[in-house]
């Protein structure tokens, strides 16, 4: 459990550093970017290795009815992330699209995984994403969203990217022994 918890903590600190210690982070200047990047890479390694090693209690098991909801939430999360990159219309209504996608992803995984490792990983990242949104909202003014027409190329690009990413991630899950469809 130590590696997994350390990975989630390192991820959170690396991402929140700018918000909780802005003066210290700004003093680091450009030299701090590689350190933050290495911290994030290290956190992913720790979370991946740690998740596989945690052996603990299971509070609930996967219910077949929730698998479809899980998959839909993950797909919507991928769409929101892709939309943030393509400028699709939904981003006019979602202030923090990437953090919103992480929250959807975490909740989706908590619906179908009630083991200790999942609670630490997905619960920890959910807490981080909620905290990040709160800190950003306190520090930054709400941006004025410009009225713009829907550009269907962007919409289809985001939708297509979400489907492709969902398929690739689903395939990788299966290869790693975590099937997404039951």
Segments (PLM) and residue ranges:
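Membrane-anchoring alpha-helices and their flanking helix-loop junctions
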Residues: 1-95, 100-182
